[in-house]
């Protein structure tokens, strides 16, 4: 896992090279859902490029491709509470948002599985999604229920979302948030057949829901 920064690709490749030099040959890499379909988004393109490296460098690797993090809603919770608007453009196709707790548990399970394997396991990619496919209207309805006051969906305008994000993050990062949101609006972020069932089976429990986070943020 490496941060979304201007030198993210350098960080990823340096880390993998140093790991190989240290004799580490089993890794779990945190990529992003549909990394290969949104390569115009810089931090998606970086992760898609880095996904190629484990096999090239001879690692036994699991590549995790999580959907949009539910936890990122902390960045916009104040807007929801103070202005009664949910600002992220996610349209009517929906996004299978995922909780970071589920991501970390799946990552730990995969690290342990590879560590305990008698030999190198092949490179494998796992989509990590949440229990529900949520549209803008769905999310606004959850916030309405949790806060006890009507919350409107702000609409499918990535440009407005960029302007909002630029109030508390660097302009280049706010722009990335805009072009990241564009495929949410055009295509959604939809799980594939069997994704959810596989994830529930791995830790042996239900996945955390968006409503859990909304309840925590409402306080």
Placement of each model-derived feature along the sequence:
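A generic "functional-site adjacency" signal
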Residues: 9, 97, 204-207
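An N-terminal domain-start capping segment
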Residues: 28-29, 215
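Acidic/histidine-enriched alpha-helical segments
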Residues: 156
């Amino acid at each position: 896992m490496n941060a979304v920064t201007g030198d993210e690709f350098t960080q990823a490749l340096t880390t993998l090279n140093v790991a190989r030099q240290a004799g580490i040959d089993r890794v779990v890499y945190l990529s992003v859902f549909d990394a290969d379909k949104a390569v115009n988004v810089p931090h998606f393109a970086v992760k898609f490029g880095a996904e190629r490296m484990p096999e090239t460098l001879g690692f036994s690797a699991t590549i995790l491709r999580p959907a949009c993090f539910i936890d990122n809603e902390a960045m916009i919770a104040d807007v929801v509470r103070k202005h009664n608007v949910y600002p992220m453009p996610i349209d009517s196709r929906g996004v299978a948002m995922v909780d970071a707790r589920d991501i970390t548990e799946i990552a730990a399970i995969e690290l342990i599985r590879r560590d305990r394997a008698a030999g190198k396991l092949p490179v494998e990619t796992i989509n990590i999604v949440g229990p529900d496919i949520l549209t803008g209207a769905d999310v606004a309805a959850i916030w309405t229920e949790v806060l006890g006051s009507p919350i409107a969906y702000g609409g499918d305008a990535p440009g407005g979302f960029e302007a909002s994000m630029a109030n508390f993050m660097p302009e280049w990062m706010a722009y990335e948030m805009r072009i990241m949101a564009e495929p949410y609006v055009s295509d959604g972020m939809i799980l594939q057949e069997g994704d959810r069932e596989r994830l529930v089976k791995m830790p042996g429990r239900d996945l955390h829901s968006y409503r859990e986070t909304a309840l925590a943020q409402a306080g």
